[in-house]
């Protein structure tokens, strides 16, 4: 399917119109459902938009698989590019950089590139999305850098779901576009966020339930929280 508007066009492949899975009885792919509306709508937005936001996914530190994130961003009309921050600069025309669950700590050279990107010649206006991994102690330098920009992460304990946390929407400006806010947000192995600087530009997006608290880093095996340890709700996502 070719979508065209003026001088811009977008080709939607047949594989982008349907969901399919392998049939091991026939050793061929079988269509299971349609995603045509989503794909065609995304293409229409692409060719009619005056500006497309560029996203740089930062690599070079043994990041977790981010293919699902890339697909979601692409479907929603973002121009997604990879940038190995150990060897390359972050693209100047990128509005957003993403660090997706790095397995190793950032060195000073990479942190300087991050700072240069976010400072943007003192004009600011850039954004960084940080998705932490499950081992925060592996990245002390990156954690220190994030603290300088006003946020830090910790360990979360949820009294009802130790691995999957039920989160609730907070900021109305962001949640107002959601059709059905009664559908809960489920976050796997979520990490609490502490806002270190008071700022009107920092918005809390998601919070944990009241039955949650901070899991001590030095907790003994089999640790169970007291009622006083459950200090929720706790910030799980902020911008």
Label for each model-derived stretch:
Residues 1-239:
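Short, surface-exposed patches at the edges or C-terminal ends of soluble domains, predominantly
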